[in-house]
């Protein structure tokens, strides 16, 4: 017919119409820079380079900067009392910095460190080991960043802390091991939250992260800051089945018992009192977060109670806004424990990472005391929190630099404490605002969907 062209003619016409775009090196350079800074796909390039850079940097630090003795000698003295002297009464185990106050997982790990470093004879071996521990933790946390689609400019922040490097390779604190197991736990939870079509794998991963979480707690109790969010996450992963969730809790308790068997058999009361002493007092002079107060107010039980109440209010607000149906789902599961319950509007892939990471940050904000090594508890989550808070590219790094200054300010002082409190409060408020706006949008979307379905039915 007239006006029609054959396919061959159309292809020929397309070839004739193609015009190669002009070469614009400046625009290409800008696009490349924009890609490397803002596009999460660039993390496949950025992350390996950062890990390589960190590996070399840690080597240089170990070689050029003198080891700083703070707690490692005390760890070794305590292990000697347990391993060489056969002391199993926790209340009698002590070192240069005081009594043993960590659970049996700490003892298990530092027995290995005692063998590696031969007590205090070869601390340099311990530094090398902690270098690998740092790099492993960094690689795992970057896996979390990749799954959560963080832009590269946020990822880079994970490698910029002077204080964190010293905590690992210059001081050999036990906090580093707890952080490793918590990163593994959160990574496992993120992966499990995406296993919508593989329920058996999801529940198996829930059991695995219960074990790794318990391992973290058995090294140092700061991992308990994750506990409320951990139970909610397991509840969601188990499709709101309270029995399966309780079985995961039993798995946590089982590890605590297994790792502490020698002490529980001999002196159970002393072990539980020393390893899980929630009333332990912290030294005011080394607490970097409340130096704007005097020592008397810092040690006041009313202040501790106010922090606890504020902590609980913040956690409750977090859970209710992120998972509004938590109470109805829990009640339904209690009424029908053997039935598979639908977790409505929970959105596991977003809810689980958010409640885990945000609840830990809330716990840090309302902690009675933060010593310098405690930075490792939450530093690895800062790139995620900054990204979630919606901070612009030019604001996030400024916040981070100020935050790092607070942790490097020595000795602890009121100016750094006040600024740290302000920075962390602002970050939490920004998280709350973005979360609230997201919840409102989700509720409106759900309402529109429900109304549309009702109209179709009518």
UniProtKB/Swiss-Prot annotation:
Regions crossing the membrane: 42-62, 96-116, 138-158, 172-192, 217-237, 243-263, 303-323, 346-366, 382-402, 416-436
The organism's taxonomic lineage, starting at the top: Eukaryota, Fungi, Dikarya, Ascomycota, Saccharomycotina
Matches recorded under PANTHER family: DOL-P-MAN:MAN(5)GLCNAC(2)-PP-DOL ALPHA-1,3-MANNOSYLTRANSFERASE (PTHR12646:SF0), NOT56 - RELATED (PTHR12646)
Keyword tags: Endoplasmic reticulum, Glycosyltransferase, Membrane, Transferase, Transmembrane, Transmembrane helix
Signal peptide stretch: none
Substrates-to-products reaction catalysed: an alpha-D-Man-(1->2)-alpha-D-Man-(1->2)-alpha-D-Man-(1->3)-[alpha-D-Man-(1->6)]-beta-D-Man-(1->4)-beta-D-GlcNAc-(1->4)-alpha-D-GlcNAc-diphospho-di-trans,poly-cis-dolichol + a di-trans,poly-cis-dolichyl beta-D-mannosyl phosphate = an alpha-D-Man-(1->2)-alpha-D-Man-(1->2)-alpha-D-Man-(1->3)-[alpha-D-Man-(1->3)-alpha-D-Man-(1->6)]-beta-D-Man-(1->4)-beta-D-GlcNAc-(1->4)-alpha-D-GlcNAc-diphospho-di-trans,poly-cis-dolichol + a di-trans,poly-cis-dolichyl phosphate + H(+)
GO CC field: endoplasmic reticulum; endoplasmic reticulum membrane
BP terms from Gene Ontology: dolichol-linked oligosaccharide biosynthetic process; protein glycosylation
An annotated Gene Ontology molecular function: dol-P-Man:Man(5)GlcNAc(2)-PP-Dol alpha-1,3-mannosyltransferase activity
Cytoplasmic topological domain residue ranges: 63-95, 159-171, 238-242, 324-345, 403-415
Main localization of the protein described in the UniProt heading: endoplasmic reticulum
Stated name of the protein: Dol-P-Man:Man(5)GlcNAc(2)-PP-Dol alpha-1,3-mannosyltransferase
Entry EC no(s): 2.4.1.258
Membrane topology category: Multi-pass membrane protein
Protein family per UniProt: Belongs to the glycosyltransferase ALG3 family.
Pathway(s) where this gene product acts: Protein modification; protein glycosylation
Function: Dol-P-Man:Man(5)GlcNAc(2)-PP-Dol alpha-1,3-mannosyltransferase that operates in the biosynthetic pathway of dolichol-linked oligosaccharides, the glycan precursors employed in protein asparagine (N)-glycosylation. The assembly of dolichol-linked oligosaccharides begins on the cytosolic side of the endoplasmic reticulum membrane and finishes in its lumen. The sequential addition of sugars to dolichol pyrophosphate produces dolichol-linked oligosaccharides containing fourteen sugars, including two GlcNAcs, nine mannoses and three glucoses.
Ranges in the topological domain labelled Lumenal: 1-41, 117-137, 193-216, 264-302, 367-381, 437-458
Places the protein is found: Endoplasmic reticulum membrane
Cysteine-cysteine disulfides: none
InterPro entries: Glycosyltransferase_ALG3
Top EC category: transferase
